[in-house]
Amino acid sequence: MIIPAIDLIEGQVVRLYQGDYAQKTTFDLSPLSQLKSYEAQGANWLHIVDLTGAKDPNARQTRLIAGLVSGLDANIQVGGGIRTEAQLAELLEIGVKRVVIGSLAVKETALVQSWFKKYGADAICLALDVNINEQGEKIVAVSGWQSGGGKSLESLVDAFKPYGLKHALVTDISRDGTLKGANTDLYREIAAAYPDINWQASGGIATLDDVAAVRDSGADGIIIGKALLIENFTVREAIQCWPNPQ
């Protein structure tokens, strides 16, 4: 499944290079117009990242996101620095279908497990942003990649599987924003190890060949941001390559 994505800083559409706020590209686009275009081309899910909120919990762009959700028919998945149950509940209340939880799942595992019990596994997507070390271990980073988390991808998945984990977004940080292609070996490995989880691939997508490679890896979906913004290909072309599930 194709999941077009936009990242927002203070209401503007941006892209970061490898999660670095200092390496930011701003696009002169209306977020709603851009997402409406993706929707019109056939996207059933859209992914929005609140980068302002990820950096400063007191500056969350919830009002903007509420306006986007109300103006769109597609299902919306939102991430970016979710730290409290109130923030999670607020996003679900404004019509967000699924909330992406990253750093907190590493730092406050029991708290996030309780949210799975309360809100259900379909309302939450774990974001596992990994640095792969020389030993091949997939170490999950936290806090907008500004620090290593020290937990392996597998240990976190195993901690949440008893709570019904269904959706997980995995980014190889070394590929993010680089347009160097996805780490398909990573997705092939985790899809084989945990076939009952819907894996979303993210990071490095540049071409339709990259989309096809992820499709064939066993991942269930692919998040595409930069390649669409710089018009390497269109959402319509991506969906022709990897049709939405019926």
Swiss-Prot record:
**Which residues does UniProt mark as catalytic?**
D7, D129
Q: Which GO terms describe its molecular function?
A: 1-(5-phosphoribosyl)-5-[(5-phosphoribosylamino)methylideneamino]imidazole-4-carboxamide isomerase activity
Give the first-level EC class, as a single word. isomerase
Q: Which UniProt keywords apply?
A: Amino-acid biosynthesis, Cytoplasm, Histidine biosynthesis, Isomerase
Q: InterPro entries, from UniProt?
A: Aldolase_TIM (IPR013785), His_biosynth (IPR006062), HisA_bact_arch (IPR006063), Isoase_HisA-like (IPR044524), Isoase_HisA-like_bact (IPR023016), RibuloseP-bd_barrel (IPR011060)
Subcellular localization, as worded in the UniProt entry: Cytoplasm
Its protein name is 1-(5-phosphoribosyl)-5-[(5-phosphoribosylamino)methylideneamino] imidazole-4-carboxamide isomerase
Q: Which organism is it from?
A: Shewanella sediminis (strain HAW-EB3)
Q: Which gene encodes it?
A: hisA
